[in-house]
Swiss-Prot record:
Protein name: Fimbrial adhesin PapGII
Position of the signal peptide: 1-20
Gene of this entry: papGII
UniProt keyword Disulfide bond present: yes
GO cellular component terms attached to this protein's record: extracellular region; pilus
Keywords tagged on the record: Disulfide bond, Fimbrium, Secreted, Signal
Cell compartment(s), UniProt: Secreted; Fimbrium
Organism: Escherichia coli O6:H1 (strain CFT073 / ATCC 700928 / UPEC)
Extra remark beyond the main annotation: Strains of E.coli that cause infection of the human urinary tract produce pap-pili (P pili) which are hair-like appendages consisting of about 1000 helically arranged subunits of the protein PapA. These pili mediate binding to digalactoside-containing glycolipids present on the epithelial cells which line the urinary tract.
Record's function text: Tip adhesin component of type P pili that plays a critical role in kidney infection through targeted interaction with the globoseries glycolipids containing the Gal-alpha(1-4)-Gal disaccharide present on uroepithelial cells. In turn, transcriptionally regulates host gene expression in kidney cells, leading to inflammatory pathway activation and renal tissue damage. Acts thereby as key determinant of invasive uropathogenic E.coli (UPEC), which cause pyelonephritis and urinary-source bacteremia.
Length: 336
């Protein structure tokens, strides 16, 4: 007689920390600095200093696929990166651009230097540090922690526009500074917040830069209209018209005047600067008789000089048509 014994089948599931994971959290500081630049003239580059001050930081970004908490019973690895993301240009309250340059970055590593808008300064530490510490490994945006790390100052210079009006200036410069904490389940994990993401992090730090401009240059007009008048299509080619404005400077200065076209020309004019006027016509534009679109004027002492903008019509018989012609360019005043 056969006896059948029921088979007992066991399914065993063991959970643990065997899968690779990475948790990245960015803590943003909210420092407010102010710096007095004193009396300056446009040919100077006043400086200001941004200081890193430890304190309460707020989570503004995270990316986690690992455990939220560590209970102290298992090991993990960590690396930290301090960040400062600083704008390359800010605007004054009256609409003038201030261009920010790096003077001394100390021990910070400057990265992604080709970016048009921002400077990126990074400093990594605690690479591959093995830890058993209990705690939150993935704090959520809005949560806070205290940062105690200290890092050196960064010194910037400011290039002032040549036509910045005289007077007192109070310029607020928002920027990002904080620490990226990276926790991982394995040795050698590396992660750096992408630069395009770092640029979008909230700029919760402020630099208040105060200075007084006591010497600059001023054009007599903010716009010029050059009129060629009513012309016959047969006699318009090569017609020349011009307007003159005066530029007054309070201090010795070298000013580079450069044209930027706003309307695309119909023809190629080699090294000559031109703008499109429509109906098959271009204007070859000169600055003080120079048709390459730029010239430099020098003030050896305070005073006024004239600047002449000329326009010479150009069109080819196979393309020109009668009509109202219109085009434009922007004239920049640039300090060396």
């Amino acid at each position: 007689m056969k006896k059948w014994f029921p088979a007992l089948l066991f399914s065993l599931c063991v959970s643990g920390e065997s899968s690779a994971w990475n948790n990245i959290v960015f803590y943003s500081l909210g420092n407010v600095n102010s710096y007095q630049g004193g009396n300056v003239v446009i040919t100077q580059r006043p400086q200001f200093i941004t200081s890193w001050r430890p304190g309460i930081a707020t989570v503004t970004w995270n990316q986690c696929n690992g455990p939220e908490f560590a209970d102290g019973s298992w090991a993990y690895y960590r690396e930290y990166i301090a960040w400062v993301v600083f704008p390359k240009k800010v605007m004054t309250k009256n609409g003038y651009p201030l261009f920010i340059e790096v003077h001394n970055k100390g021990s910070w590593s400057e990265e992604n230097t080709g970016d048009n808008d921002s400077y990126f300064f990074l400093k990594g530490y605690k690479w591959d540090e093995r830890a058993f510490d209990a705690g939150n490994l993935c704090q959520k945006p809005g949560e806070t922690t205290r940062l105690t790390e200290k890092f050196n100052d960064i010194i910037f210079k400011v290039a002032l526009p040549a036509d910045l009006p005289l007077g007192d200036y109070s310029v607020t410069i928002p920027y990002t500074s904080g620490i990226q904490r990276h926790f991982a389940s394995y040795l050698g994990a590396r992660f750096k917040i992408p630069y395009n993401v770092a640029k979008t992090l909230p700029r919760e730090n402020e630099m208040l830069f105060l200075f007084k401009n006591i010497g600059g240059c001023r054009p007599s007009a903010q716009s010029l209209e050059i009129k060629h008048g009513d012309l016959s299509i047969n006699s318009a080619n090569n017609h020349y018209a011009a307007q003159t404005l005066s530029v007054s400077c309070d201090v010795p200065a070298n000013i580079r005047f450069m044209l930027l076209r706003n309307t695309t020309p119909t023809y190629s004019h080699g090294k000559k600067f031109s703008v499109g006027l429509g109906h098959g016509w271009d204007s070859i534009v000169s600055v003080n008789g120079v048709d390459t679109g730029e010239t430099t004027m020098r003030w050896y002492k305070a005073g006024t000089q004239n600047l002449t903008i000329g326009s010479r019509l150009y069109g080819e018989s196979s393309k020109i048509q009668p009509g109202v012609l219109s085009g434009s360019a922007t004239l920049l005043m640039i300090l060396p």
